[in-house]
Amino acid sequence: MTQTIKKYLNDSFAARWTALVLVASMMFFAYMFVDVLSPLSTLLESTKGWTAENYGTFCSSEYFLNVFAFFLIFAGIILDKMGIRFTGILSGAVMVVGASIKLFAISDLFSPESGLYNFLNSFWTSFPPTAKLASVGFMIFGCGVEMAGVTVSKAIARWFKGKEMALAMGLEMAIARLGVFAVFRLSPYLSTALNEAMPTVVTPVLVCTILLLIGLIAYIVFTFMDKKLESQQGAADEEAEEQFKVSDIGKLFTSKTFLIVAGLCVLYYSAIFPFQKFATGMLESNLGLPTEKAAGLFSWFPIGAMVLTPFLGAFLDNKGKGATMLICGALLMIVCHLTFALIPLTKTIAYFAIILLGVSFSLVPAALWPSVPKLVEDRYLGSAYSVIFWIQNIGLMAFPIIIGLALDKTGGYTVPMLIFASLGILALVLGLWLKVEDKKNGYGLEEPNIKK
């Protein structure tokens, strides 16, 4: 007698990679919206009257509810209780709502004649009403995008378990970063598309809001595929996953290795995403470039990361060395930020530093996210990702404000870049510590994901 081997939908190469493209599409458009105003910070100052500090506070608002209302923790609980289909659709809908509020805030529809405008202008007068309402929208959007990031990570872990997980996560990150490249190129162009003499921040935000709707539709299509996979696998796997208890979160905060990973994450990403918000302005200031050219120069950063991350993910799947990759990524980031801080800048040096940062931004995420399932049980993997994202959000909220203040106080970018470099040094220390812990306890961070 021959034994029948049951095939599932995710055993199909075409099906699991189609699923990846669908969930990654939502993150592609989400990342576009996150940075749609990053190349236009100087335009916000000239058309909306925002200062650098106002802009930094606005950027930080994306993370406010995630940090202080503990929304990300709740998002992880929702994910572990309700599953990836419900949580993914919810996150996409929340992003669209937040984006729509932000769009209204910066449009001419939100005028000084409105009662809401006058109310928002009645307090904290140094922060314009447009910035206040845009920040509210960005807060809501931030809840959705972080929930989406956690959900997509768990979805990939489910569809690619025992397969090309690191490669899949690397490709998802690559597609998302292509969104950053696209918006740094597209946003300055869209700002002048209707009237070159009167650039506006409204058109880029409108286009990216529409794209968020398309991303939500793509995820809804994925949910039909996931429903079929669940029906094939039966209830056993899902039931095991649903045995999550809220008390399991306490295990994360008592795990030294998990906290090292979370600390490394917040330090590293706090030197990446806040820098991304100010990079165009830095290149404009230090190289004397117009906005479009400065944004175009920096747009090569996500492209470098996009190209390399899948290859590094494949290397991690087959050869391992995850902890070593984290250390190398932190080193390269330190070199990049010190270059911008201490070396007289030319376009050649700027390209070199940006490419270096792109390589760094390939190494760390490619190794970091696939390592988490090696440290925690599947039943609270969603909560583990949420806790990491929550801790990360604390840094992502704090450092745009710190950098904006440093810019207003010093009038230059040397101090901000030294702040970013110091974060890289601390991340390097934690990377070395993590490698020691892995060697001592045998977590398998240096081992390949695909077992032969």
Region locations from a protein language model:
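Extracytoplasmic gate region of multi-pass secondary transporters
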Residues: 37-41, 255-309, 369, 399
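Helix-to-loop junctions at the C-terminal end of transmembrane segments
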Residues: 70-84, 309-321
